[in-house]
A protein has these predicted regions:
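Short, amphipathic alpha-helical interaction segments positioned at domain boundaries
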Residues: 396-421
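Short amphipathic alpha-helical interaction segments
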Residues: 362-376
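A short, conserved structural fragment
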Residues: 376-386
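Short alpha-helical scaffolding segments that buttress acidic/His motifs in well-ordered protein cores
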Residues: 54, 341-346, 402-403
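Flexible, acidic/Gly-rich N-terminal and inter-domain linker regions that tether
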Residues: 1-39, 49
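Canonical Radical SAM [4Fe-4S] cluster-binding loop centered on the CxxxCxxC motif
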Residues: 34-69, 157-158, 162
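C-terminal scaffold of the Radical SAM
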Residues: 61-80, 89-362, 421
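Minor-groove-contacting beta-hairpin "wing" of winged helix-turn-helix DNA-binding domains
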Residues: 387-392
């Protein structure tokens, strides 16, 4: 689609600029503002095996590295407490946070003691949906996100996940068995793998419906330059020309018809209509600002992006020296902050125009005339009044494509930083 290609190139230009982190000698992140609500993100980068399509900050699991890492993650958490930060919500991502379950539980328990958390979300893989692990997470974790990616065994073998994390049927059975142990269980899926056919996608959707998961997130394949070669070798070349068609198939199955099983939670997250309390997967939608701890974490604070060291060894050294792990910073201009707000709120399906005017002192159209006109031109806005903007199906896909490119840009920053490690 022409408009999507134009937008993609534009987003790449902007992300290249405002993800261009400059080294910083700051000993810590900025402190909190009294009226601001924050979510805490903690990153655990260790995985049993490294998937060929993934370029998130991750390293092969080595216990001698992981034990001090978890200890230092808890120490960095104490640093935030000493700075005056408070949190009601903690999101632990990876990597595979459950790779050392006792260390993870100790980290969650400390966070609850320090901050009085109301909710904890963490990620895991299907092979960790075992009774001994679930029993430790249940009650500690309100929302569990399971990285399935696909239920198709052919794709799982190409992804090098089948032997490590289990077959599609094994994953489905484990999800069904674990679902009631948590307030919300989210299934993470990926669509538009090079070798994925429409029939494979339809089967994945059928498995989701059978699982009756509280929530499902369908991410488009995000191929950063560092994994392009391994991805092409194992799965083939990515074809973006069919991405929108696959996305609309997902939306139709999950949200279409007279009695749809799911409703939109964000542009790529779907929550079960039968579960009013389902927690949305995207912490960046619910909270505009967030500090991140752990190797490779990205914080958005005080109108700027901060990046933590991508080296596990350097991370441990910095924390043990009494510093936080931040090593880079990109200050945002007012226009950058507007673009970030525009992207994140529309990704969350509704832009709050009143809040925009309070924060920026102008209308959306005046603040971002090019972006606003572009979205109007391509028919991305379904509804607009003095208070809000809502999206059409085309608009939702444009946000999926936009966020895909944003995260590809983030992953490129990770790639470049890891090359220097």
């Amino acid at each position: 689609m022409l408009f999507e290609r134009i937008q993609t190139r534009t987003v790449r230009l902007f992300t290249h600029r405002y993800l261009g982190f400059k080294p910083t000698a700051l000993p810590a992140l900025p402190g909190p503002h009294p009226q601001q609500t924050y979510v805490l993100y903690a990153h655990v980068p260790f995985c049993k095996t490294l998937c060929p399509y993934c370029s998130f900050n991750r390293y092969p699991f080595v216990q001698e590295q992981a034990v001090p890492y978890f200890k230092n993650l808890r120490q960095e958490m104490r640093m935030l407490k000493d700075m005056g930060y408070g949190f009601k919500s903690l999101y632990i991502g990876g990597g595979t946070p459950t790779i050392m379950i006792d260390e993870l539980c100790a980290t969650i328990d400390l966070a609850r003691d320090l901050f009085g958390l109301e909710e904890v979300s963490t990620e895991t893989n299907p092979n960790h949906l075992e009774p001994q692990i679930i029993s430790k997470l249940s009650g500690r974790v309100q929302r569990l996100s399971v990285g399935v990616q696909s239920f198709d065994d052919r794709l799982l073998k190409q992804m090098e996940r089948h032997d490590t994390y289990g077959s599609g049927m094994e994953s489905l059975e484990r999800i069904i068995a674990a679902k009631d142990s948590f307030d919300s269980l989210n299934v993470d899926m990926i669509f538009n793998f090079p070798s994925q056919t429409e029939d494979m996608l339809i089967n994945d959707l059928a498995c989701i419906l059978e699982s009756q998961a509280n929530q499902v997130t369908f991410y488009p394949l995000m191929a950063s330059p560092s994994v392009a070669r391994s991805l092409a070798r194992s799965l083939g070349q990515v074809d973006y020309s069919r991405e929108e068609r696959y996305y609309q198939m997902i939306c139709e199955v999950l949200t279409g018809g007279k009695h749809p099983p799911y409703a939109f939670g964000s542009a790529w997250t779907f929550k079960a209509i039968s579960d009013e309390s389902a927690m949305i997967d995207e912490y960046i939608v619910d909270y505009e600002e967030y500090p991140a701890i752990g190797s490779g974490g990205l914080s958005y604070l005080d109108g700027g992006l901060y990046v933590n060291t991508f080296s596990v060894e350097e991370y441990n050294d910095l924390i043990e020296a009494g510093r936080m792990s931040v090593i880079g910073k990109t200050p945002f201009t007012t226009s950058d902050r507007m673009r970030y707000r525009f992207m994140m709120q529309l990704f969350g399906l509704q832009l709050d125009k009143r809040q925009w005017e309070r924060d920026f002192g102008c209308s959306v159209a005046a603040g971002l005339p090019v972006e606003y006109s572009f979205f109007k031109l391509v028919g991305a806005f379904a509804f607009e009044d003095d208070e809000k903007i809502l999206l059409t199906p085309r608009g939702r896909y444009l946000l999926v494509a936009l966020m895909r490119e944003f995260f590809v840009g983030v992953n490129k920053v990770r790639d470049e930083a890891r090359q220097r490690v």
